[in-house]
Amino acid sequence: MTVTQLSYKDAGVDIHAGNDLVERIKGDVKRTRRPEVIGGLGGFGALCALPTKYKEPILVSGTDGVGTKLRLAIDLNKHDTIGIDLVAMCVNDLVVQGAEPLFFLDYYATGKLDVDVASSVIKGIANGCEQSCCALVGGETAEMPGMYHAGDYDLAGFCVGVVEKSEIIDGSKVQVGDTLIALGSSGPHSNGYSLIRKVLEVSGTKPMDLLEGKPLSEHFLAPTKIYVKSVLELIKQAEVHAIAHLTGGGFWENIPRVLPADVKAVINEASWEWLPSFKWLQEKGNISRYEMYRTFNCGVGMVIALPEKDVETALKVLTEAGENAWVIGKIEALGSGTEQVEIL
């Protein structure tokens, strides 16, 4: 019996397509370059020096994905902003500790590589890196036949930043009397999408149906805000005690992560109005108030704790940086209670 001569391409892996992708994204990657980066794409590992301005540099690392927001993006053939979400989820986690993002790597996996789709995704990643002054130094594109349904892909991101040891923000300085400032979100960001998709399903609503004049898809696929530049500027001009990034777990789980055990955050619900998308979700899904605050950011991307004396400066800095910022609450003694977040 004569066996047909086989190639890797016959097995479903097209090396030439991978090389074509690299060529397409080179210009986008180059725009993210920082002076600390040594060399370019194509090495076995990416090289990056530490910025010389740091006396005791501490590296801060993080990894994340975009959850099932990716499912919605794939279903709607909207690939150009999901990469921004990927970067945002990583760099926002770094900056809350006072860290400046240095470099980013991505992992893109699919059953059959579509160069047009992949390049669109990676252009979005490069866009996010530019917004956060973070170098896209490399990544992995894995073409794995039989592992994914046709048209599907998965994403993960990895980021490393640096902070001066004496300037790490870890919540240890939070004290009774501190003021809480909110930074507005662009929408659900990259959390709660399994529930969002369930609400769409049970309500019989289509993503292209309109909400306040624009398709629901635009509300739900709005890219996650990247707060790096505004928060780093704030840290330079104000005494920041803690920053919480409101991701999975919402208010109830993320704010306590940055609080000492003997205090609580008291949130004034009347200080802001939920975005239309959150009102729609609560109504169409019959979702309880508690569940909304546990699953979604409800219009608040970050919560910052700082002394009352710095509130005016902080609001000015954040507003000038383009943020929607407002006083959302205060820090009080925990007392006899056990809940570290109260929403009144």
From Swiss-Prot:
Pathway participation: Purine metabolism; IMP biosynthesis via de novo pathway; 5-amino-1-(5-phospho-D-ribosyl)imidazole from N(2)-formyl-N(1)-(5-phospho-D-ribosyl)glycinamide: step 2/2
Cellular localization per UniProt: Cytoplasm
For this UniProt entry, the molecular function terms from Gene Ontology, in alphabetical order, are:
ATP binding; phosphoribosylamine-glycine ligase activity; phosphoribosylformylglycinamidine cyclo-ligase activity
Q: What class of enzyme is it?
A: ligase
Q: Mind telling me which GO cellular component terms the entry cites?
A: cytosol
On the tree of life, the source organism's domain of life is Bacteria
Indicate the transmembrane segments per the record: none
Entry's family note: Belongs to the AIR synthase family.
Q: What is this protein called?
A: Phosphoribosylformylglycinamidine cyclo-ligase
Q: What is the lineage of its organism?
A: Bacteria, Pseudomonadati, Pseudomonadota, Gammaproteobacteria, Pasteurellales
Q: Which gene encodes it?
A: purM
